[in-house]
């Protein structure tokens, strides 16, 4: 997606805001330079909210300003104009105008937006994450439904359809997810991100991953009280479906269960020879579905360093490399 022009009418510091972007055929990046308070973050927030508004009526209701957005995507020239409550969308030679509901249906049928959006904000006044969290609530619900449909297909001989997980469209790195990016990069295949991170931070490899799973969330998928004892057999059953290659690692890394949580210390993830994308997607499912929390310890020379104890600069680098590279 290449944005060509953005016009915003009277939103916070963006008053009669109109900016044209210099684009290069075949793809290009845009750098925003400006003084503090010039509206750089507000502009990025507006672009993100415009994209999310076509996935979430709740976010659309928050946009109380008129705007015009012109961009190129999938070899199409697209224009979206919002004036009050009226919309007009043009995609090459096709055009539609009317209410939000009408144009939203048109946009979804014609694939006018990217399938993956990555957002990153390193400042203190983070206005991006709350709305991304709202949109991703539906993603988490769809993942839970996928697990329940899987269980239904296993328990009903007439069900022959094995469901697939949806793809996460809006990606934003919460602080608690930084360790997952770290282990995905270091335990995955050879890549630019892996080489750069090792060289820049002098990391050697992942020594182990401490993981805590909320087993109450696991039992909610099955129905409470289905599994008894300390061993999280219900979790293993679900991870076999999510990605069976990780289940044995979890079994060997299991330590104990207490007060509705199961504790693991996982080693030798890189020995399984799984690529970074598969590692990320597996642990992201555990993070989103079962409130799993992680601590990754890496070797750095003769020392061991936890992800939570790394410098702010190292953690920001891990986020950027993970979100853009995997």
What is the meaning of each model-derived region?
Residues 1-3, 26-27, 37-38, 63-65, ...:
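Short, well-ordered loop/turn elements at secondary-structure boundaries
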Residues 2-45, 326:
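Pre-Walker A-like glycine/lysine-rich segment at the N-terminus of P-loop NTPase domains
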Residues 9, 20-22, 70-72, 81-83, ...:
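A structural detector for beta-sheet-dominated domains
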Residues 11-14, 24-27, 37-38, 51, ...:
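Short, solvent-exposed loop/turn segments at secondary-structure junctions
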Residues 18-19, 45-48, 82-85, 130-134, ...:
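Short coil/turn segments at secondary-structure boundaries
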Residues 24, 180-326:
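Extended helical coiled-coil dimerization/tether regions that scaffold
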Residues 44-102:
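Conserved P-loop NTP-binding catalytic core
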Residues 90-229:
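Electropositive, glycine-dotted interaction segments
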């Amino acid at each position: 997606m290449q944005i060509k022009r953005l016009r915003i009418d009277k939103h916070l510091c963006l008053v009669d805001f109109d900016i044209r972007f210099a684009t290069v055929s075949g793809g290009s990046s845009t750098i925003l330079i400006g003084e503090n308070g010039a509206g750089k973050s507000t502009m990025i927030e507006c672009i993100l909210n415009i994209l999310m508004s076509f996935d979430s009526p709740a976010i659309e209701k928050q946009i109380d300003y008129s705007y015009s957005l012109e961009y190129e995507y999938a070899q199409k020239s697209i224009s979206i104009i919002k004036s009050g409550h009226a919309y007009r969308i043009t995609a090459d030679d096709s055009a539609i105008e009317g209410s939000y509901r009408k144009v939203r249906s048109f946009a979804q049928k014609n694939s006018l937006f990217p399938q993956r959006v990555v957002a990153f904000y390193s400042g203190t006044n983070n206005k991006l994450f709350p709305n991304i969290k709202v949109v991703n609530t539906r993603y988490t619900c769809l993942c839970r439904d996928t697990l329940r449909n899987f269980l239904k297909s296993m328990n009903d001989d007439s069900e022959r359809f094995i469901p697939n997980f949806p793809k996460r469209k809006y990606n934003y790195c919460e602080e608690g997810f930084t360790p997952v990016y770290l282990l995905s990069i270091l335990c995955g295949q050879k890549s630019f991100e892996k080489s750069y991170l090792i060289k820049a931070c002098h990391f050697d490899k992942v020594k182990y991953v401490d993981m805590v799973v909320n087993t109450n969330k696991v039992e909610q998928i099955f129905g409470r009280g289905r599994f008894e004892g300390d061993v999280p057999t219900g979790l293993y059953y679900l991870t076999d479906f999510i990605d069976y290659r990780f289940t044995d690692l979890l079994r060997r890394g299991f330590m104990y269960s207490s007060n509705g949580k199961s504790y693991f210390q996982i080693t030798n993830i890189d020995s399984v020879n799984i690529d970074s994308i598969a590692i990320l997607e597996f642990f992201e499912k555990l993070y989103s579905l079962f409130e799993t929390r992680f601590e990754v310890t890496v070797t750095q020379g003769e020392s061991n360093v936890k992800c939570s104890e790394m410098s702010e600069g190292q953690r920001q680098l891990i986020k950027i490399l993970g979100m853009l590279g995997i």
